[in-house]
């Protein structure tokens, strides 16, 4: 819609000149923001100030955005701009007429305040909050407050069930004709550990149906969707997903493109910035996606270690109890598998580097990390048994045979081809080794420092960034031997990451 096509006044449509959209190319990472000049007549007439929540309309499309004020030369008084996500949502073009008005009051904020003060919420209150979040009515500061108010055990099991249900209702829900629809998920917290694509390929080669949808990274250097995106197309529609699964029996796609529990993707974006992931949010995030995807049998991998997300067995027991309670409310069958979370799994940490590990394992090359292969075969075997595709006690052997025969690799190729084609992951421009300060034995590797180093290098936003592990616990090293190699796409990020790595040693070496 161009300015000369419609003389629509801002606000209530009386007495103000229309605002004309001017693209500025500002990326706020999915947060809707509108930019106006401080002396804009609409601001003066309506009393708008910076950080006000306003309703923005272009034609028939509208959304709620946060107001930022910017002056000349970026904007004149009769111009308005939008963040990239808001412009995309409104399909805005240069010259479009923009109308703004006061945003409607949000009744759910009362429930949010109650939760901040430690009160229990009922299902209707939680549903109202999630409904407003998924509709884009909450600014990030409100979402942050909700996440913080629910963290550290502040949400009980009944609330967690209600949260999960509200998140399922916030989007679409898939259904399948198969009695058993398998899935595999890892709670995260362990750098590398990209077993899911390998497990899906093995299990699908063994006859299971796995419409696998994955999230992007929350607090880690890569999520399964981030990693798979370096290999194939992951943003599929529901119709495309169904076609892929009907054709090859499995998928490896990003759940965010399917409108499955869309509130979860918004929460994940803010959780990533806060670097938090509470039990209640973790359970609701995982299980809402599984319910929405139509899964019936879910294997959940839980790495346990002193620097993993789940640090002790008692934490695992608490998480498993919550998972089983919520899963039972939705008729889901779950199998929790405790795995070693004392050190990173595989060599690559970061989307492209982890993708290379996946290819090496599936192609059975000499470069395949043995630990990643072993863990993947064990989990795939457990899933085959859990879903009745292998006799009890015979799953791991069956999984190993499916991998060694090349059946899993052929299935993975088929999945990627069905999703748009298989491509080779890229490589970073800059690399630098972090070396051992002295000779000795590696006695520990700090997962959190490793993950932080990889993220400072640019992962997961820069697909080729991250780090490559050169040692494992119990390895003997000499002075000056590389412990890991940092990969970055910008020299500044390389320096930043390496400075952190040197100031916060991730690899503990006991001198001889």
From Swiss-Prot:
InterPro entries reported for this sequence: Glycosyl_Trfase_fam3 (IPR000312), Glycosyl_Trfase_fam3_N_dom (IPR017459), Glycosyl_Trfase_fam3_N_dom_sf (IPR036320), Nuc_phospho_transferase (IPR035902), PYNP-like_C_sf (IPR036566), PYNP_C (IPR013102), Pyrmidine_PPase_CS (IPR017872), Thym_Pase_Put (IPR028579)
An individual GO BP term: pyrimidine nucleoside metabolic process
Key words of the record: Glycosyltransferase, Transferase
Catalytic activity line of the entry: thymidine + phosphate = 2-deoxy-alpha-D-ribose 1-phosphate + thymine
Enzyme Commission code(s) on record: 2.4.2.4
GO terms for MF: 1,4-alpha-oligoglucan phosphorylase activity; thymidine phosphorylase activity
UniProt KW Glycosyltransferase keyword: yes
GO cellular component terms listed in the entry, alphabetical order: cytosol
UniProt keyword Transmembrane present: no
PANTHER family in UniProt: THYMIDINE PHOSPHORYLASE (PTHR10515:SF0)
Family assignment from sequence similarity: Belongs to the thymidine/pyrimidine-nucleoside phosphorylase family. Type 2 subfamily.
Name of this protein: Putative thymidine phosphorylase 2
Species per Swiss-Prot/TrEMBL record: Cupriavidus pinatubonensis (strain JMP 134 / LMG 1197) (Cupriavidus necator (strain JMP 134))
């Amino acid at each position: 819609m161009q300015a000369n096509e419609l003389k629509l006044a801002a606000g209530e449509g009386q007495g103000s000149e229309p605002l004309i959209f001017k693209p500025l190319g500002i990326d706020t990472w999915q947060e809707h923001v509108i930019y106006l000049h401080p002396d804009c007549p609409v601001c003066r007439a309506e009393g708008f100030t910076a950080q006000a929540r306003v309703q923005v309309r272009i034609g028939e499309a509208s959304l709620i955005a946060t107001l930022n004020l910017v002056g000349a030369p970026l904007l004149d008084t009769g111009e308005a701009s939008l963040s990239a996500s808001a412009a995309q949502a409104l399909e805005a073009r240069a010259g479009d007429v923009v109308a703004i008005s006061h945003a409607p009051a949000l009744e759910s904020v009362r429930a949010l305040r109650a939760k901040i003060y430690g009160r229990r919420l009922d299902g209707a209150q939680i549903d109202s909050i999630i409904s407003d979040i998924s509709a884009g009515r909450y600014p990030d500061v409100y979402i942050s407050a909700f996440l913080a108010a629910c963290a550290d055990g502040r949400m009980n099991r009944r609330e967690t069930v209600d949260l999960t249900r509200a998140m399922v209702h916030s989007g679409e829900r898939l259904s399948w004709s198969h009695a058993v629809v398998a899935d595999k998920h890892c709670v995260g917290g362990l750098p590398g550990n990209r077993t899911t694509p390998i497990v899906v390929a093995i299990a699908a080669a063994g006859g299971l149906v796995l419409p696998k949808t994955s999230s992007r990274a929350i607090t880690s250097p890569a999520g399964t969707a981030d990693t798979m995106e370096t290999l194939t197309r992951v943003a599929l529609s529901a119709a495309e997903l169904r076609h892929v699964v009907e054709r090859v029996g499995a998928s490896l796609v990003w759940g965010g493109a399917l409108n499955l529990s869309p509130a979860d993707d918004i929460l994940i974006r803010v959780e990533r910035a806060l670097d938090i992931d509470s039990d209640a949010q973790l359970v609701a995030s995982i299980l809402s996606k599984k319910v929405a995807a139509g899964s019936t049998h879910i294997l959940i991998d839980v790495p346990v270690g002193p620097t993993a997300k789940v640090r002790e067995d008692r934490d695992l027991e608490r998480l498993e109890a919550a998972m089983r309670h919520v899963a039972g409310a939705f008729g889901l069958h779950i199998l929790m598998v405790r795995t070693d979370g004392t050190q990173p799994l595989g060599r690559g940490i970061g989307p492209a580097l982890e993708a290379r590990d996946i290819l090496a394992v599936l192609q059975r090359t000499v470069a395949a990390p043995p630990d990643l292969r072993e863990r993947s075969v064990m989990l795939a075997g457990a899933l085959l048994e859990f879903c009745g595709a292998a006799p009890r006690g015979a799953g791991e052997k069956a999984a190993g045979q499916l991998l060694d025969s090349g059946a899993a690799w052929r299935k993975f190729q088929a999945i990627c081809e069905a999703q748009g084609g298989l491509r080779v992951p890229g490589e970073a421009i800059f690399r630098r080794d972090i070396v051992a300060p002295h000779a000795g034995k590696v006695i520990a590797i700090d997962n959190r420092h490793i993950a932080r180093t990889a993220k400072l290098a640019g992962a997961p936003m820069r697909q080729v960034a991250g780090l490559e592990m050169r040692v494992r616990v119990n390895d003997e090293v000499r002075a000056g031997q590389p412990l890991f190699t940092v990969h970055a796409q910008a020299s500044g990020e390389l320096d930043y990451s390496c400075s952190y790595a040197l100031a916060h040693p991730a690899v503990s070496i006991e001198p001889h």
